[in-house]
Amino acid sequence: MKKIYLDNAATTPIRQEVSDEMVNVMQSEYGNPSSTHSVGRSAKAVVETARKLIAKQLNCNAQEIIFTSSATEATNWILRNAVSHFGVKRIITSKIEHH
């Protein structure tokens, strides 16, 4: 019987070719992309290539693509920037915005 998964808020099934590429990159480019040594620079190059590919698909600049470590970090980042850079005075939200 085929599974139907409807809880994609925090997780989602991964296509096999995506999983294969992720494993390949994690095994070969394991450096910290924030480091200045050669392994870190190599990892950073992979991240920047991904950023450019995503930007091309979204028809935007690579500088507009921001990677965060979680939905919580992303939500906090956008809310803080809405207040500090765009003068947003009031934010209305609910408990269901991030479960």
Predicted regions, residues:
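Pyridoxal 5′-phosphate
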Residues: 1-99
